[in-house]
């Protein structure tokens, strides 16, 4: 069982849902990212996605695009991000770590080489938003050979046959995009969210995590009333661009994580029929 599967099993045993946090690795520095990941874990975050910065991040909104540019300017690259993962594991970090990036950065060193190095460093899964399920055979095989979970995507526009195919191939969890477009904070979650998650759950037992647009505890509660986890990125990344002293940045991220994680625990009193954020 992968570390990701083990985490979801632990959450089920607690009657709890998951919180997955995204950080752009190297923003504002790799050393700060290391401290931020530990702060997230201490706050109860269940998994962390580390964005491997790419110069043309098509799926990312302005907040994460800016973070990627800051990380690139600070010198973040595949080698030192994987070194960061290895350092986090050497520190004793136990929660799952995933790399989110674009396929060009996987192809550049060779698919098998990238997957082998990622797994050796301590990465548990890969998220590649520009690799559709129909074109994922090579990377899926290479990832599976070294124990990496390749995360599959579904969206509100996904037809039933694509949902079924993603469900068949899914490992770790299925990333359900809450709305079309790019990442970023949104004031309101779409009314079709429940139907999309239920459509996925009708064809698989693989956990479903919802991302894009989630930034507040009430949105986490709304999402996890129907899904197995909420993914939060821009709300964390935004703090990294504020030029704060490191200790203040780490503390702000820790507090936000604690507030968001509280929304995944039982007894929140939210009805799964209501997925719109109240104004």
UniProtKB/Swiss-Prot annotation:
State which pathway it belongs to. Answer: Amino-acid biosynthesis; L-tryptophan biosynthesis; L-tryptophan from chorismate: step 5/5
Q: Which SUPFAM superfamilies match?
A: Ribulose-phoshate binding barrel (SSF51366)
Show the GO MF annotations.
tryptophan synthase activity
CDD domains from the UniProt entry: Tryptophan_synthase_alpha (cd04724)
The terms describing its cellular component in GO are:
cytosol
**Could you tell me the superkingdom of the organism this chain comes from?**
Bacteria
Q: Give EC number(s), comma-separated.
A: 4.2.1.20
Alphabetical UniProt keywords: Amino-acid biosynthesis, Aromatic amino acid biosynthesis, Lyase, Tryptophan biosynthesis
- One Pfam family in the UniProt entry: Trp_syntA
Q: Does the keyword Lyase apply?
A: yes
* Function recorded in the entry: The alpha subunit is responsible for the aldol cleavage of indoleglycerol phosphate to indole and glyceraldehyde 3-phosphate.
Q: Which family does it belong to?
A: Belongs to the TrpA family.
Oligomer status and interactors? Tetramer of two alpha and two beta chains.
Q: Which HAMAP family match?
A: Trp_synth_alpha
By what name is this protein known?
Tryptophan synthase alpha chain
**Which species does the entry assign this protein to?**
Symbiobacterium thermophilum (strain DSM 24528 / JCM 14929 / IAM 14863 / T)
Gene name in the database record: trpA
């Amino acid at each position: 069982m992968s570390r990701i599967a083990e985490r979801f099993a632990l959450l089920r045993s607690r009657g709890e849902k998951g919180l997955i946090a995204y950080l752009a690795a190297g923003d504002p520095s790799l050393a700060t990212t290391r401290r931020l990941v530990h702060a997230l874990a201490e706050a109860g975050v269940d998994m962390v996605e580390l964005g491997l910065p790419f110069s043309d991040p098509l799926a990312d909104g302005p907040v994460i695009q800016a973070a990627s540019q800051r990380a690139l300017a600070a010198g973040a690259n595949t080698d030192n991000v994987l070194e960061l993962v290895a350092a986090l594991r050497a520190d004793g970090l136990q929660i799952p770590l995933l790399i989110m990036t674009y396929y060009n950065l996987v192809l550049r060193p060779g698919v098998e080489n990238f997957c082998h190095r990622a797994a050796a460093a301590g990465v548990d899964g890969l998220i590649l938003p520009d690799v559709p399920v129909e074109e994922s055979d090579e990377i899926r095989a290479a990832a599976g050979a070294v124990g990496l979970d390749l995360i599959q995507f579904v969206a509100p526009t996904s037809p039933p046959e694509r949902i079924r195919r993603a469900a068949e191939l899914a490992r770790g969890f299925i990333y359900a995009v809450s709305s079309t477009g790019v990442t970023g904070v949104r004031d309101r979650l779409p009314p079709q969210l429940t139907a999309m998650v239920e459509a996925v759950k009708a064809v698989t037992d693989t956990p479903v995590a919802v991302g894009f647009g989630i930034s507040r505890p009430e949105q986490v509660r709304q999402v996890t009333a129907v899904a197995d986890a909420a993914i939060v990125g821009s709300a964390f990344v935004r703090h990294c661009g504020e030029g704060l002293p490191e200790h203040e940045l780490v503390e702000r991220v820790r507090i936000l994580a604690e507030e968001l994680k509280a929304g995944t625990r039982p007894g929140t009193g939210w009805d799964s029929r209501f997925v719109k954020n109240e104004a």
